[in-house]
Design a protein with these regions (language model features):
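Active-site neighborhood of HAD-like aspartate-dependent phosphohydrolases
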Residues: 2-71
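Short amphipathic alpha-helix with an adjacent loop that forms part of the alpha/beta core around
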Residues: 13-14, 146-152, 207-219
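Substrate-recognition "cap/lid" segment bordering the active-site pocket of phosphatases
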Residues: 115-158, 164-173
Length: 219
């Protein structure tokens, strides 16, 4: 089933077989998901504690209150995407960096685990942020999708994501893909620390762009 989904995405998106490919996550890479989510739950009287790189277990019912149930947090995330996807602010460094890379011949795909109810809002947000590249909506581990997309080009493929398990999935199924880890929110980035499955980690889009140029555009 997953292989079929991945093949369908690879078939849908046009990829030049001779140019490098950059596959980019959206939340916490292009968009400031965490900052917007904190505002959203704060409006409901909840607070967030940075104890682990997860939402479940870290959203409190009120200040110093008990953690919300996992299903309640899941419902909050769904409601957030349904109502606020268009309002999540972009990382202002992302669009200029991506467009500079595009002008150098890098082709770009946005691979986002966005809920189906928010796909069109995510497209709107990407366009509004001047990130006008194909969006590949996804769910679950990203290894099969990245492998399918990477198989369409002889050029180098680069993958950027904030989630360690996605890097592990890509390392397992597409080890030739160069994996860059990046998290916009500094507290989350510090909390996660070193990601063993990533080839490199960056603290901003300036560093990401340099890594990509050095890997994809130099012989």
């Amino acid at each position: 089933m997953t292989d079929t989904r991945a093949a369908a995405i690879a078939e849908t998106i046009e990829i030049d077989p001779l140019r490098p490919l950059l596959i980019v996550d959206a939340d916490e890479v292009l968009f400031q998901f965490m900052a917007a989510f904190l505002t959203f739950i704060g409006e409901k009287g909840h607070t967030f504690v940075f104890r682990s790189y997860a939402l479940a277990g870290n959203v409190l019912a009120y200040k110093d209150g008990p953690p919300l149930e996992r299903q309640t947090v899941s419902d909050l995330v769904t409601e957030f995407f349904e109502k606020r996807t268009r309002e999540i602010p972009a990382d202002l460094e992302a669009a200029p960096a991506l467009n500079r890379l595009m002008l150098k011949g890098v082709q770009i795909v946005i691979l986002s685990n966005v809920p189906s109810i928010a796909v069109e809002d995510r497209r709107y947000s990407l366009n509004a942020a001047n990130i006008k590249f194909p969006l590949a909506p996804w769910s679950g581990p990203k290894g099969t999708a990245v492998a399918a997309l990477a198989s369409k080009t002889q050029g180098k493929t680069i993958f950027i994501d904030d989630i360690a398990s996605h890097h592990e999935s890509v390392a397992d199924l597409a080890p030739e893909v160069y994996r860059l880890h990046y998290v916009i929110h500094p507290k989350l980035r510090a909390l996660l620390g070193k990601v063993e499955a990533a080839n490199d980690q960056a603290e901003n889009w300036f560093e990401l762009e340099k890594f990509i140029r050095d890997h994809a555009l130099k012989n």
